[in-house]
A protein has these predicted regions:
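Extracytoplasmic "Venus flytrap"
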Residues: 36-61, 65, 70-83, 87, ...
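Short, low-complexity disordered leader/linker segments with a strong preference
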Residues: 1-38, 111-116, 364, 373-378
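Flexible loop/turn connectors
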Residues: 261-330
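Flexible loop/hinge segments that line or gate small-molecule binding clefts
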Residues: 111-155, 177, 276
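Hinge/cleft segment of the Venus flytrap/periplasmic-binding protein
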Residues: 35, 299-378
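An alpha-beta-alpha
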Residues: 39, 43-45, 58, 146-202, ...
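Periplasmic-binding protein-like
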Residues: 40-42, 92-100, 119-124, 173-176, ...
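Hydrophobic alpha-helical
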Residues: 96, 101-115, 191, 214-277, ...
């Protein structure tokens, strides 16, 4: 009888253990199934004018899609750019979006992502196949490099130079941010092409000076602008090529402190928070920008790759072109501010719908983003 009771007790304990193990396994599976997607963002700065706008729209998308986001600010310093991919991969990110500086950095970034099985997409950048064939080939064959979202920077450069020429400016100085930066090189090509085209068809010739580099802070932007003006007191225009917005803030402060506000026409890329006031008072002549949703599209590419919705080729990658907006008057800016500053151009429901688009339809939605597009959805 004692033996029978012992056997029954052992069976009961074993049954309880099996049920407990089965329950724990089910709970673990459920926990795994409901694990949040985690996407890392490697950005020059998440706090300057453009960077904070990028963060705002990414955070809104992450909230709408229940995605965890992690940011690394790398200042467009090469070693920080490459280490950011390592940091985000080690932190358990399923994918990352990155705004690198030089295309050469992408060799390390892509290798890190491929080794760690982390999906990757560029924003505000694309690897040029002609100038960086090795990096391009590596990106194309990686099963984890999803694609790149970028602007037509050459066209952007041409348009800004043309705006200055049409306003009667003749001697144009140029302030970049980092020598060799992939986006700056394209904009510079556009500035030069704009000068060549203008001079080929107009008698009032214009001149573009060689670039000086002002980094990505307001202090370095200011000191570089001061040096440019002191060395070239007869300039009547300055292009501040970009750098996130702080470089321009410093350059404008330099121009005002030197008594040159309204005398030196300034154009730039990356909208300032006070662009309306700068246009009214002559601080700015024109600006291209409104492109802070570019990283949103890169985010959607990576999100859908993680979900298995967008196949990742080993013989190419997705290439998405993002449109610029151009503002040259307070009236232009008022329309922009209503739909891109006071509110975001996409609400939560629209972000969810965007995440459900095919890749081709995502490209179409990207191409048509404009003030009129947002108006039509409100």
């Amino acid at each position: 009888m004692k033996k029978l009771l012992g056997v029954l007790l052992a069976v009961a304990v074993l049954g309880t253990t099996l049920v407990s193990c089965s329950k724990k396994q089910s709970e673990a599976k459920a926990s795994s199934d409901t694990k949040k997607i985690k996407i890392g963002v490697s950005i020059w700065s998440s706090t300057d004018t453009l960077g904070s706008q990028c963060k705002r729209i990414i955070d809104e998308a992450a909230k709408a899609l229940d995605v965890q986001v992690m940011y690394v600010d790398q200042g467009h310093i090469s070693e920080n750019v490459t280490s950011s991919a390592e940091t985000l991969s080690a932190a358990g990110c399923d994918g990352i979006i990155i705004c690198n500086s030089a295309s050469a950095e992408m060799t390390s970034v892509i290798n890190t992502c491929t080794q760690n099985k982390v999906y990757c997409a560029q924003f505000f950048r694309i690897i040029n196949q002609d100038t960086n064939p090795n990096e391009y080939a590596l990106a194309a064959k990686s099963p984890y490099f999803v694609g790149a979202v970028h602007e037509n920077e050459i066209e952007n450069g041409e348009k800004l130079v043309t705006i200055l020429a049409e306003k009667g400016n003749k001697k144009i100085a140029l302030e970049g941010w980092e020598a060799g930066d992939a986006t700056f090189l394209l904009r510079w090509q556009g500035y030069k092409q704009g000068v060549e085209k203008w001079n080929a068809s107009h008698s009032n010739k214009i001149e573009l000076l060689e670039p000086q580099y002002g980094g990505t802070t307001s202090d370095t932007g200011r000191s570089t602008a001061e040096a440019i003006i002191n060395a070239n007191p007869d300039i009547d225009a300055l292009i501040v090529a970009g750098g996130g917005g702080d470089t321009l803030v410093g350059a404008l402060a330099a121009i005002e402190s030197m008594g040159k506000k309204g005398k030196i026409a300034v154009v730039s890329t990356d909208f300032l928070a006070d662009l309306d006031e700068q246009l009214k008072t002559g601080g700015m002549a024109a600006e291209s920008g409104g492109h802070y949703c570019d990283p949103l599209i890169a985010f959607m590419l990576v999100y859908n790759a993680i979900q298995g919705n967008y196949p990742v080729s080993t013989n190419g990658f997705y290439d998405v072109n993002f449109p610029y907006l151009y503002v040259a008057s307070p009236e232009d800016y008022a329309a922009y501010a209503k739909y891109f500053v006071d509110a975001l151009p996409y609400n939560a429901e629209e972000l969810k719908a965007m995440a459900a688009l095919s890749e081709k339809d995502l490209e179409i939605a990207t191409a048509k983003l404009s003030i009129e597009d947002v108006k039509s959805r409100r």
